[in-house]
Amino acid sequence: MKKTDRKKLEKELDKLWSRAVISRDKACRYSNSTDRLSAHHIRSRRHAITRWNLENGLCLAWSVHFLQKANPELFHDRIIEIIGQKEYNRLKKISDQTYKWSLEELERIKEQLLEAINQNG
């Protein structure tokens, strides 16, 4: 698989991950709104090991997600409020590990994300 093919697969996984998070949560985890939903990575997507892990995502209304840029400290506090400090620390510990996914693993992740989307409708 060429590098461009890998990048295409990663982009596809990003979209599937987002759909899977939104289909799982169905509403903003902070406000319970169903208006203008987006999927948010709790730990940045730059951390490869947790980038497509559904535990590292939650559904937020755009108005809540907007706080990430407007007031990062308040936004971080809200994320902790939603998932709890213990869960945040667990995700942080995992995400701090360096990892390079093989192509076979990326294909397996794709299957898992599609399955999650199908299960949650």
Residue ranges and their predicted role:
Residues 1-16, 32-33, 90-121:
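A boundary/linker detector
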Residues 3, 14-18, 24, 67-77:
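Positively charged, helix-rich recognition surfaces that bind polyanionic ligands
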Residues 2-6, 42-45, 61:
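Short, flexible active-site loops
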